Every structure is written in C-alpha cells, then in structure tokens.
Amino acid sequence: MYNVPSRTGCNILPETAVKLAKEVDNIVAIKAATGNLSQESKTMMLAEGCLDMYSGEDGLIVPLMSIGAKGVISVLSNVAPKQTHDICAEFFAGNVEKSRQLQFEALELVDALFCEVNPIPVKTALNLMGMEVGPLRMPLCEMEEANLNKLKTALKNYGLLK
C-alpha cells in the first residue's frame, strides 16, 4: 500500500492502514510518504507486526527506520544507489550515528530531486551523470533554469557530477 497524500489527495489514516492489513492477505507493507512522523509512529504502534513500513520520503529514511521502518522505496536510490544503501545498512548494523550523518549529507540532493515534479529531476540528473535514460515525455517539460542549477550544484556537492 502506498500512502502519498501529496499526490493522491487522500491520506490513509493509521487505523485504516492497519485494518486493511488485517483484512486483506496480500497487504503486507506500507510505503509511508506523508512526511508526518507522528502519523507514521501511530501506524507502527497500531500495526503490532501485521504491517511492515518502508520510507517513501528520502529525507526521512533514518527517522522512519528509528520507529520501525524496514528500509526505503526511494527516488534518491535511482541517482545514488550505493549511498542510499549505505544509509540503511549502517542503521541496521547499529551504526545509527553514521547512518544519520549519511542522511544529512544526502539532504541537499534530496531537496533538489524534489524541486519539481517527479520524474523530471531524477531523469535530468541521470542524463547529466551520463546515463542515457532518454528525454522527458509530454506532459513533462524541462526543468526551470534555477532548479536545474540547484540540481547540478547538489550533484556536484554530493560527488556525482564534475
């Protein structure tokens, strides 16, 4: 199940998510992308093991794992797969401070990857990095120049672009 109210206009409340997980056999996890740590905490508290959680917010990987999320379903991982893996691996190895630091280092790039509607920034980033993922298709359009510069700067600062 994917809870992304910013895209759907509908927020799946914790009670509803848990009820669905208990009543529908093939609902086993939720991708949490509300940005609301209080709500996600309540979901985990009510789930009592019947529902796994994955972060759907690249800027909140560590906070969501700290309340029980099993990992992340990520936009960032398309551009920085090793770094995204390392954030999770360090956390699960018990190196929470290292994981937290890696999360902080990724924040500028995370912000840049979401400065326009997905997948515009991620496809642009991959093309800039030399991975030919093709052009954007209608109705998507090229990034605004200020946002493109923000993305380029973030990629450079993160060591992904020269």
For every predicted segment, state its role:
Residues 59-162:
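Structured C-terminal cap/extension of enzyme domains
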